[in-house]
């Protein structure tokens, strides 16, 4: 089914994003974050994030409509993040989308936030990184963010199966907790990646083993935080050595798990689809590109939560 003008709304966590697509191309994306507010708490406070979304949603929508040179009655379909996410935050987009859909007499379609991330490399904003033919099924979908770290079997847009996921902390969450302990500004992932030096990436031993038996990062996180607490005020503490050793350990472990999935699948996967906030990490991207499978990665502006990915995934479902 074809819809000329599609509105997208994303509000699953601390970002509020509005996007508009015309004729299957994203023409505007407006994303606003409340991360500066949450920085005082070292993490996202759901009630504060939801209130922030409510306060700026109308203004952000008007900005998007103005940039797209549209009036609101030109919208043919509304897409919004339905799950997963923070319930208070999800509620904002759901109520707004369904109310607006009722008033305009147009459909409102809820979209899975994680599947939006999986297909985010394929977002077409007039300067698409890849051709649709670059995505060959079956694909391996990878989501790595502050809330989720998971690996999926992607047979088609509507046939996605979870293969493996962390038992506890997502990688992005560990980055933020480590960054907070080091006094880095929230969210800390980008700063840690910026400080990363491969020549100093094996100088700190957080654990007595270089392998984790389970797909779990809570124990490793505790070990890193314990090391920081004991050493950060020492005169010989080296920040670059600490963050480089941390990043190499956790990304290498994740890459090994991806390799295990690929090997067990007997090389059936033709493409890797990478999405989520941590997908912008330079070391993760470089390691994935070393694999013998074509890896599709999103533009940095689409690696975090955004409404363009919600529209994009909805379009893939509609075009099946």
Curated annotation (Swiss-Prot):
It catalyses: L-threonylcarbamoyladenylate + adenosine(37) in tRNA = N(6)-L-threonylcarbamoyladenosine(37) in tRNA + AMP + H(+). Fe cation binds at residues 113, 117, 305. It is an enzyme of class 2 (transferase). Keywords: Acyltransferase, Cytoplasm, Iron, Metal-binding, Transferase, tRNA processing. SUPFAM superfamilies: Actin-like ATPase domain. Belongs to the KAE1 / TsaD family. Required for the formation of a threonylcarbamoyl group on adenosine at position 37 (t(6)A37) in tRNAs that read codons beginning with adenine. Is involved in the transfer of the threonylcarbamoyl moiety of threonylcarbamoyl-AMP (TC-AMP) to the N6 group of A37, together with TsaE and TsaB. TsaD likely plays a direct catalytic role in this reaction. This is tRNA N6-adenosine threonylcarbamoyltransferase. It comes from Mycoplasmoides gallisepticum (strain R(low / passage 15 / clone 2)) (Mycoplasma gallisepticum). The gene is tsaD.
